A protein has these predicted regions:
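Class I S-adenosyl-L-methionine
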Residues: 1-226
Length: 226
């Protein structure tokens, strides 16, 4: 005989753990964004950290520089020219990321998503920041594996050419100006997309609401440096 709790719909169950006192069981609820100026609301966004303390930048692996040497990271602009709340918000995301397990992340994500009128179908990791180390790659791929069971695709970009991606199976990664085993996509910044686009490369329309190339495997994409 099934217990009474077995009859509780997922949406009602999710409400218990994401609102009121239950919000303490679901801290991820305040750390996920639904889309932005370019991404659709069906894409959840989570950062492993802010651009200002990006591991790739600290290791001199970031390639977001103009020919004259000026740093042109788009994520950094949000922390320096927009609301002062952006940086502390991303620091909270970093704090959460460093202690959460893949299983806990996905459990909370699914509960939050169950309450949405327009559910997320994708998770974009690292609108800002990058992998802190190898354990972040492993955790992110496990999250991607678990979310795939719920028909949510997980993808990201990285400058961390020093890390090992050979065991990545589910996370769709675009290497920023580099590609190696385990990274199926290549994403390049160029000065002029007409003049500098290599043969076989697609041009980023800079509007993810009409394009999904970066979440598909086997893509080569150029974007105008901005």
């Amino acid at each position: 005989m099934r217990g009474a709790c077995a009859e509780i719909p997922l949406k009602n169950f999710a409400k218990i753990f994401t609102s009121g006192r239950g919000k303490h069981f679901c801290p991820l609820n305040k750390l996920l964004a639904s889309g932005n100026l370019k991404l659709p609301k069906t894409t959840a966004i989570f950062n492993m950290g802010p651009a200002r303390v990006c591991p790739a930048l600290a290791l001199n692996l970031c390639r977001a520089f103009t020919p004259t040497g000026k740093h042109c990271c788009y994520a950094m602009k949000a922390e320096t020219t927009r609301t002062p709340l952006v940086f502390p918000y991303r620091m909270e995301q970093q704090k959460f990321w460093k202690k959460v397990t893949a299983e806990d992340f996905v459990s909370q994500f699914i509960l939050i998503n169950a309450l949405k009128e327009l559910p997320w179908t994708k998770l974009r990791l690292n609108e800002a920041g990058d992998f802190h180390g190898q354990s972040c790659v492993d955790k992110a791929d496990k999250i991607a594996m678990l979310l795939a069971r719920f028909k949510v695709k997980t993808y990201c970009y990285t400058h961390r050419s020093d890390l090992d991606f050979t065991k990545v199976r589910y996370l769709v990664i675009s290497g920023s100006n580099f590609q190696k085993e385990g990274i199926p996509n290549l994403f390049m910044m160029v000065e002029d997309v007409k003049r500098d686009r290599p043969k076989g490369f697609s041009v980023c329309p800079e509007d993810c609401r009409i394009c999904d190339l970066c979440s598909k495997r086997g893509q080569k994409i150029v974007i105008k440096r901005h």
